[in-house]
């Protein structure tokens, strides 16, 4: 009777339970050991990566748990330091190569098993079966690309994934005691400290040359192994370099458009500090070229000398040696002192001029200057035309010449050069012979505003040249009386205008000897 009743029940419910039959048969061994009393607490979320106790291998294959790989050491090729994974190795090698990593590869998100509802009474077996069946269907449908929500159990919460946290900035807690520069670890701090000392602990085994850093020694050893290789190639222009730091410097100097180092004096900007220091030399003290006198900075004085056909350096005016920064600073200070002295002298002269132009100092100073000028002109006239002493030395008049009193005759046997204006405002009487045996050059205007009388012979044995018509006009505005013979044996050249007012030509017999036979003249 019981067997027939059981067969009837299974036949009645065969259509409704046909879809869950496969999952129940595979999970019966697990469910037999997982039955709990009614007062059992809710089950906590179980990560998929965690293997349940007593689970068969089919569940492990369905969920897709990966086997742990054996740990392998990742060793740096530059300093032989070992790391636990390839990412940390590549991040460490970027310190040697100078190439920064863009970002760390993303981790695979962790999938969490949803929370299972409270299980109570005899229905615990059915609810547990349906829940685990829903989990299995979720995993299989998500791997095939279908929507997992359609086959998941109604008592299960949505699957959550871990959110990636933003990367924290690297802390640089290791500071140098000498310069204050900070580093992220002790290794880089110790490598930096070598720059403050002369210690070179790494020695080349071939040529015994010593280096401060091991990577520098490694690059040097490569030069002994069949020549210098250039394995580091620029991705932009294809140029090769033997060291990674040389490649990074090349990229910054040539291909980079960033100019973070700016000049405080002008608007120039540069990619590196070295180029900024080279530029700052232009704003320092300058040196004058000993050939052309042009002011140039010490950085460009050598190249400037090549334009004059010289390659040697200019010697310092202080120590007579080649120009250096110390000599430049001393010479710059000397130039500043000279400029300050010149400025003080100019200020004193300006103060004196202001005092002269003020009243009553203006009148006093004007009278003093006028008296000094009169004395100078009288002295020059007395030296030129002395009654008892002949002019035996060349006479050059470089200032305006005025004759304000009577002048007697004399003898001149040396050149007389009039390089400034000569003005006669009083009668000039020549009562004795006047002999001029050397050239007489008049390079400036000669103005005669008073009678000129010559009662004795005037002999000119050398040419009288009036060189230019602009700078040497001869103006005769008063009568000229010549009562004695006038001999002009040599040609008299008039290259400048000759203006004679209030006198007819017939009263001057000497003009036909100097002028052409017919006008214009």
From Swiss-Prot:
Identify a single GO molecular function assigned to this protein.
Answer: zinc ion binding
What are the GO BP annotations of this UniProt entry? angiogenesis; cellular defense response; endothelial cell development; positive regulation of endothelial cell differentiation; positive regulation of transcription by RNA polymerase II; regulation of transcription by RNA polymerase II
Record note on quaternary structure: Interacts with ARHGAP22.
Q: Keywords, A to Z? A: Acetylation, Activator, Cardiomyopathy, Disease variant, DNA-binding, Metal-binding, Nucleus, Repeat, Transcription, Transcription regulation, Zinc, Zinc-finger
The entry's protein name is: Vascular endothelial zinc finger 1
Which residue intervals are annotated with compositional bias (Low complexity) in the record? 140-155
Query: What PANTHER family does the record tag this protein with?
Result: MYONEURIN (PTHR24394:SF29), ZINC FINGER PROTEIN (PTHR24394)
- Keyword Cytoplasm in record: no
Q: What does this protein do?
A: Possible transcription factor. Specifically binds to the CT/GC-rich region of the interleukin-3 promoter and mediates tax transactivation of IL-3.
Positions of the UniProt region annotated as 4 X 7 AA repeats of P-[LV]-T-[IL]-T-[ST]-P: 394-485
Q: Which GO terms describe its cellular component?
A: nucleoplasm; nucleus
Q: Which family does it belong to?
A: Belongs to the krueppel C2H2-type zinc-finger protein family.
Annotated positions of the N6-acetyllysine modification: 362
Q: Where are the zinc fingers (C2H2-type)?
A: 74-96, 174-196, 202-224, 232-255, 261-283, 287-308
Gene behind this protein: VEZF1
The cross-references to InterPro entries, in alphabetical order and at most eight, read: Znf_C2H2_sf (IPR036236), Znf_C2H2_type (IPR013087)
């Amino acid at each position: 009777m019981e067997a027939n009743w059981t067969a009837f029940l299974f036949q009645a419910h065969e259509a409704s339970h046909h879809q869950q039959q496969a999952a129940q048969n595979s999970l019966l061994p697990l469910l037999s050991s997982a039955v709990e009393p009614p007062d059992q607490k809710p089950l906590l979320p179980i990560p998929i990566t965690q293997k349940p106790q007593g689970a068969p291998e089919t569940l492990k294959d369905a969920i897709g748990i990966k086997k742990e790989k054996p740990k392998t050491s990742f060793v740096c090729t530059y300093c032989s330091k070992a790391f636990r994974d390839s990412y940390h190795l590549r991040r460490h090698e970027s310190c040697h190569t100078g190439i920064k990593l863009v970002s760390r590869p993303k981790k695979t998100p962790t999938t969490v098993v949803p929370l299972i509802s409270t299980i109570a009474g005899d229905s615990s077996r059915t609810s547990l079966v349906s829940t685990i069946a829903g989990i299995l269907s979720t995993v299989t449908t998500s791997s095939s690309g279908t929507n997992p929500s359609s086959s998941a159990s109604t008592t299960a919460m949505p699957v959550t994934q871990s959110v990636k946290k933003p990367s924290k900035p690297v802390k640089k807690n290791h500071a140098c005691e000498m310069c204050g520069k900070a580093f992220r670890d002790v290794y880089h701090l110790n490598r930096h400290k070598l720059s403050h000392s002369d210690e070179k602990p790494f020695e080349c085994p071939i040529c015994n040359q010593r280096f401060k850093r091991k990577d520098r020694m490694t690059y040097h050893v490569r030069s002994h192994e069949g020549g210098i290789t250039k394995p580091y190639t620029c991705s932009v222009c294809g140029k090769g370099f033997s060291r990674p730091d040389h490649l990074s410097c090349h990229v910054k100097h040539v291909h980079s458009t960033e100019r973070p180092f700016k000049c405080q004096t002008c608007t120039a900007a540069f990619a590196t500090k070295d180029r900024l220091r080279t530029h700052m030399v232009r704003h320092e003290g300058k040196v004058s070229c000993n050939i052309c006198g042009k002011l140039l900075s010490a950085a460009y004085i050598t190249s400037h000398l090549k334009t004059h056909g010289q390659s040697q350096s200019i010697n310092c005016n202080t120590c007579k040696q080649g120009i250096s920064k110390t000599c430049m600073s001393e010479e710059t200070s000397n130039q500043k002192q000279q400029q300050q002295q010149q400025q003080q002298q100019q200020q004193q002269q300006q103060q004196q001029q202001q005092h002269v132009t003020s009243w009553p100092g203006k009148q006093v100073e004007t009278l003093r200057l006028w008296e000094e000028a009169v004395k100078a002109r009288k002295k020059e006239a007395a030296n030129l035309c002395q009654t008892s002493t002949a002019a035996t030395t060349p006479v050059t008049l470089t200032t305006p010449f005025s004759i304000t009193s009577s002048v007697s005759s004399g003898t001149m046997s040396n050149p007389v050069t009039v390089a400034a204006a000569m003005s006669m405002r009083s009668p000039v009487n020549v009562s004795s012979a006047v002999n001029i045996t050397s050239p007489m050059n008049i390079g400036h205007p000669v103005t005669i505003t008073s009678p000129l009388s010559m009662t004795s012979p005037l002999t000119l044995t050398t040419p009288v040249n009036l060189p230019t018509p602009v700078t040497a006009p001869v103006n005769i505005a008063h009568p000229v009386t010549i009562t004695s013979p006038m001999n002009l044996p040599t040609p008299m050249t008039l290259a400048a205008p000759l203006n004679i007012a209030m006198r007819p030509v017939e009263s001057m017999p000497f003009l036909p000897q100097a002028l052409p036979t017919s006008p214009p003249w």
